[in-house]
């Protein structure tokens, strides 16, 4: 049975970018419809991405902490892992959050349409549910938040159930004895953390000379030193062939770490994501989509068609939920007639591994590429009382300052729960703070958070928790 809906705004996709845009539109008094292919709101992030992976990472952390509790005189027997119960726990987390979104959509009177949507013209789209039943949506304005999907390589037999993408890995159907992860990025390393804790022998193959290539090498080096105790990293090595056989998946590699064919019980392909721009017939609405599937927008998130906007993964890197949320707010407010635009100074990035690798603002490699006059200040967690007491002293807080103005350009943290410490650094960059502003802010002791203030003291030459390389310089200047 076909239906037709007329609305002021339709949002295509209900991930963090999409539902944030829809809810903001509704809050601003706009009649809003949201179209989503999943049976629940939340998109990839809540259903098969950010949230379920964090639930499993929490399980992994509990397992690892129990293993090492004997250092403090607490002894646990070998954990008995019931996959069905672990899976149920993960799904309960997802259900709680997606259920909350459904309640908020209802409270805001946002109409939810389930189905895959495609444009038919610049003011119409059609969403088809699982049975093929169409719902036609006539709109004044549209916000495209159609997201992205995992990259698939033509030489890999992706149809084999032992070859996974990130969605498959999160299903937790089994714990393979030997798991290869193709790609040393955030998604691959997070899932490697989970499966290693659950009992898999994990190997990671990465083309670049470091994992998490976007982060600075000194930051990643601290992570690498710890993770190599758990699973094997094969850097500067590429996969040349993948063959599925009855007794396993055979992967041929060549490069610095391996020139051989190895057998695995499962392979996780985590080499990035591609935008869904070519899957929604955007061209029928007049919206331009580039060869890669991205839709280009201006600072108000407008496409080349003035009443059609795009947000989230589909508009370009970084493909991060928190970026998409802010883009969604901008699009909604512009449609409502407000003067708003998207121009953040910083977008934080976090690998929720153990330890976490997190950074915000400019990296040191970016400063070098841009020819900036900068200075780095580092505070090692080996000098942090809280880190030592919490047995996570193999970490570091790093700040990057403009050498002339002393303003904060960027920062990175590697350590347990390091991502939780990024907020102050991001705010400092947005507000134009300098090193003195941070150093003179009293940070609670003992906390991991105080490492940010102590790194600023290193730059200022006022540090007393470490040998002060600038002490003599300061005395002379007086």
From Swiss-Prot:
This is Dihydrolipoyl dehydrogenase. It is an enzyme of class 1 (oxidoreductase). The active site is a redox-active disulfide bond. NAD(+) binds at residues 183-187, 206, 239, 270-273. One of its GO terms (molecular function) is dihydrolipoyl dehydrogenase (NADH) activity. One of its GO terms (biological process) is pyruvate metabolic process. It catalyses: N(6)-[(R)-dihydrolipoyl]-L-lysyl-[protein] + NAD(+) = N(6)-[(R)-lipoyl]-L-lysyl-[protein] + NADH + H(+). Homodimer. SUPFAM superfamilies: FAD/NAD(P)-binding domain (SSF51905), FAD/NAD-linked reductases, dimerisation (C-terminal) domain (SSF55424). InterPro entries: Class-I_Pyr_Nuc-Dis_Oxidored, FAD/NAD-bd_sf, FAD/NAD-binding_dom, FAD/NAD-linked_Rdtase_dimer_sf, Lipoamide_DH, Pyr_nuc-diS_OxRdtase, Pyr_nucl-diS_OxRdtase_dimer, Pyr_OxRdtase_I_AS. It comes from Haemophilus influenzae (strain ATCC 51907 / DSM 11121 / KW20 / Rd). It comes from the Bacteria. One of its GO terms (cellular component) is cytoplasm. Lipoamide dehydrogenase is a component of the alpha-ketoacid dehydrogenase complexes. Its cofactor is FAD. It is found in: Cytoplasm. The active site is at residue 445. The keyword NAD applies. Keywords: Cytoplasm, Disulfide bond, FAD, Flavoprotein, NAD, Oxidoreductase, Redox-active center. Disulfide bonds join 45-50. Belongs to the class-I pyridine nucleotide-disulfide oxidoreductase family.
